[in-house]
Regions:
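A domain-level signal for the structural core that forms small-molecule/cofactor-binding pockets
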Residues: 1-207
């Protein structure tokens, strides 16, 4: 089955992944042939097609082929009604336009309701990692992370996600600007000035 979109998800078995690696390696060798790279006779490149295919399936794009993180949500027994914030979560992804990396950090937050669900902080990291490991644009990554947090934190009063990243497609080609791109997705209470400002203050405190 093909992914409908580059940043989609179709979980594969280990056997299917190995078949994909072999198939992708064969095609990447042809890609290098088209670029007139004599990779078969270069000791530094002779295994490059297999290395690249393995890296994409098992690391760079593993979010396309693995099951999502198992997340257990707990009842908010203490009726905590403040913000839950986790910032500076590493983002290692790559754009679906040029297949070049973009690297940065994600800041996430949600406000549980007194009768809603809460999750462990490590689960926010796992959500970011799961969606980062696939080809996409930063805007979509921001929305995917937001929507997953919104689903698992049932009854929440609001979710906020911000991503700050440097894109290699801008740094090494074209205008070659070492600029930082910021994207955000806010919902619920974070649409209001005070919670939104508190979130931004938490992000600013990390600088």
């Amino acid at each position: 089955m093909k992914l409908k979109y580059a940043n989609g998800n179709t979980p594969l078995t280990e056997e299917q992944k190995q078949e994909m690696i072999l198939d992708a390696a064969e095609h990447y060798g042809k890609y290098m042939d088209a670029l007139k790279i004599d990779w078969r006779n270069d000791p530094n490149s002779s295994d490059t097609p297999h290395r690249v295919a393995k890296a994409f399936v098992n690391d760079l794009a593993e979010g396309c082929y693995n099951q999502g993180p198992k997340i257990t949500a707990f009842d908010n027994l203490d009726e905590y009604d403040g913000m839950v914030f986790q910032g500076n979560i590493k983002v290692n992804s790559f754009c679906s336009h040029h297949h070049l990396p973009f690297i940065g950090v994600a800041h996430t937050a949600y406000i549980p309701s007194k009768d809603g669900k809460i999750i462990g902080l490590s689960k926010l990291n796992r959500i970011v990692e799961f969606y980062s490991r696939r080809p996409q644009v930063q805007e979509n990554l921001t929305m995917q992370i937001h929507d997953h947090i919104n689903r698992v934190c049932e009854g929440n009063l609001g979710v906020a996600v911000m991503i700050e990243a440097n894109h290699m497609c801008a740094c090494v080609r074209g205008v070659k600007h070492d600029a930082t791109m910021k994207t955000s997705k806010l919902s619920g209470a974070f649409k209001k000035a005070a919670p939104r400002q508190e979130f931004y203050n938490f992000v600013g405190d990390l600088k």
